[in-house]
A protein has these predicted regions:
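Domain-scale recognition of functional cores that engage charged ligands
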Residues: 21-272
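Single conserved hydrophobic/aromatic residue that forms the stacking wall/gate
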Residues: 1-20
Length: 272
């Protein structure tokens, strides 16, 4: 999406895992280079699937946070291309009418809405109680709150212990955490961009993000597994899924071992 962090000029070949210091616009990429990115096309298709008859859809975020607002603008544009009528409403301008329906700043009833706002925060707000009866379709759906809660990690490990795609994880205070030894990562159940994450390496706090506002709740402990490092950057690969199909790949790099809100989105290219 339109992240304010996209300001880096290193390019990584996914197959060769090699760096090229020259910028992409200099025309140095080979003619057969490709990028794994079908995000726009798949989102347009998905909007049409969810709303086959078109219609009015609200989009909401914090209006003053530039990165979130630009992301929502991008989605509004795709919704319009899909034949919908997007309408933005700031998250703090959503109200409740006498019939228990959510309304926007112009008193239009919100029937369907994409919100760039955490479900866990939404469920703590004053308007959480009317949600089940407000007759509003919310994108992303409420079950996505389970995936953004790190409590799922110990539960997955408990059900699928030893799975190669999982790291050993326990709720803090669980006797099982002793098997992690003296190297692990301490994470809040709710946290974003590395906030309040601490990395313990051989019994020593090797790196920590002390701010972020997530330090008061419960924590998990997860086995320490360092991300790959190229030159002076630690790199992680992320992906977007639209519906049930992969739609794009992202590379984020950070100078530290914890990926933070200052990490960089790095363009990529793929060669056969």
């Amino acid at each position: 999406f339109f992240s304010s962090r996209r300001r880096h000029t290193r390019y990584i070949s996914v197959t060769g895992v090699q760096t090229c210091a020259l910028p992409i616009w200099a025309g140095v990429l080979p003619a057969d280079a490709d990028q794994f990115n079908s995000l726009s096309e798949k989102l347009i298709t998905r909007f049409r699937t969810i709303f086959p008859n078109g219609g009015f859809v609200h989009f909401s975020s914090d209006a003053d946070f530039v990165e979130d607002r630009q992301t929502v603008r991008f989605l509004e544009d795709l919704a319009q291309q899909a034949g919908l009528e997007p309408q933005f409403v700031a998250i703090d301008q959503i109200g409740l009418n006498a019939d228990g329906r959510f309304v926007d700043h112009e008193n239009w009833i919100i029937q369907a809405m994409f919100k760039l706002y955490p479900w866990e925060q939404m469920l703590r707000d004053d308007y959480a109680a009317p949600l089940p009866t407000a007759d509003v379709r919310v994108l992303e759906p409420a079950w996505k709150s389970i995936l953004s809660n790190k409590a799922i990690l110990p539960l997955l490990w408990e059900r699928h212990k030893g799975h190669p795609n999982l790291l050993e994880a326990y709720f803090e205070g669980d006797p099982g955490q002793a098997t992690l030894g003296n190297s692990y990562v301490r994470k809040p159940l709710f946290s974003r961009e590395g906030a309040n994450v601490e990395l313990i390496d051989r019994g020593v706090s090797a790196e920590a993000v002390v701010d972020g506002g997530y330090g008061q709740g419960r924590f998990i402990r997860q086995a320490l597994h360092d991300t790959p490092r190229f030159d002076d950057a630690h790199v992680i690969v992320g992906s977007w899924v639209v519906g049930d199909e992969p739609a794009g790949m992202s590379l984020r790099e950070d100078a530290g071992r914890i990926t933070r809100d200052t990490s960089r989105f790095v363009p990529h290219f793929i060669r056969d």
